[in-house]
């Protein structure tokens, strides 16, 4: 949706440029921060990160949007690691990139596209996805509930309960709260309280050639990790 809206703003700005310079300037001012967010979150991941109702093959590609931004508006992306308003945090180490969601499930006024992906993460190596969320395999129908569920994401189910109560296909009742996050050169930290009041904290660290994930929860927990296609795991 971010990329769809970014293209809409670009088209609107081009359309009003000759007729309304003030409106053109207002629209143009949105382009740089939107470009920075798109690039910072997606570059190095090898795909659109699969948080909430995200997916590939819906909006135009990041590369095509960057080309248009450069040609039409002379805009180049600025890489950032923290987006506290949206709750996304990035960690980069050589060819490794980790992206974690430490934000609210969705805007309060429109939570229907939100998933139970609090403190979930994705990992890519040399632009190849390794750990991914399950995405939006079905937008309507019997599988919609699974794709929005906690277990469909790289996070923790506490006491068998969902992080937030997803009603129907595009509704959310009680939801996560007290969500916060932060990041440094080799770590990402996030914490939150689930809909039923259980506290969850997560720290992701990069140590040499290892990615260490530390979880702290109130109650018993089951962790879920989803490998990208063509990858297998081995317990050691």
PLM ranges: what are they?
Residues 1-132, 182-187:
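Carbohydrate-active enzyme catalytic cores, enriched for enzymes
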Residues 78-236:
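Non-catalytic C-terminal accessory modules of carbohydrate-active enzymes
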């Amino acid at each position: 949706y971010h990329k769809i809206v970014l293209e809409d703003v670009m088209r609107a700005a081009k359309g009003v440029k000759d007729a309304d310079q003030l409106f053109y300037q207002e629209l143009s001012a949105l382009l740089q921060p939107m470009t920075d967010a798109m690039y910072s979150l997606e570059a190095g991941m090898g795909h659109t990160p699969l948080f909430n109702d995200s997916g590939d093959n819906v909006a135009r590609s990041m590369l095509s949007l960057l080309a248009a931004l450069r040609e039409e508006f002379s805009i180049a992306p600025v890489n950032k690691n923290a987006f506290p308003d949206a709750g996304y945090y990035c960690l980069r180490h050589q060819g490794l990139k980790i992206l974690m969601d430490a934000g609210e499930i969705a805007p309060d006024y429109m939570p229907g596209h939100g998933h139970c992906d609090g403190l979930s993460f994705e990992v890519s190596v040399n632009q190849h996805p390794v750990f991914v969320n399950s995405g939006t395999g079905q937008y309507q129908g019997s599988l919609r509930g699974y794709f929005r569920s906690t277990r469909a994401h790289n996070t923790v189910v506490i006491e068998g309960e969902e992080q937030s109560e997803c009603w129907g296909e595009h509704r959310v009742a009680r939801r996560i709260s007290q969500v916060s996050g932060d990041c440094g050169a080799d770590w990402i930290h996030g914490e939150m309280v689930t809909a039923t009041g259980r506290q969850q904290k997560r720290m992701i660290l990069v140590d040499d050639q290892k990615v260490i994930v530390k979880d702290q929860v109130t109650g018993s927990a089951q962790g879920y990790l989803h490998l990208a296609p063509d990858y297998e795991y081995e317990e050691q």
